[in-house]
Amino acid sequence: HKEYRRQRQMCIRDRNGCTAVCEGANMPTTLEATKYLQEHGVIFAPGKAANAGGVATSALEMSQNSERLSWTFDEVDAKLKSIMINITHNMVDAAKRYGHEGDYVMGANIAGFEKVADAMMAQGIC
């Protein structure tokens, strides 16, 4: 059974000293596995935050193209690093602000919601 195999792999990782897991796709980790990791003190970075670099790099490319610029690898890398640090800070701060310190799934969800809600309010949509 797939779920049994997945849970077994989680136990093996835990016994081998795994301290952090970053999702590498859109929600590949089951809710049960996420809960297991969190309950066992494993830092869990959800895909919506951990994978934001791909979307951010696409946005940087579109910006570069629209302005007819040509950035070096180091320039793009510095901009991406700044974006990812900002995403991480927003995720961590949101989780802490709402009483879920260390729960990066909760933090990423809250921070994402706040960003969309703020944009909607700024546009007068709500």
Annotate each PLM feature.
Residues 1-12:
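Single conserved hydrophobic/aromatic residue that forms the stacking wall/gate
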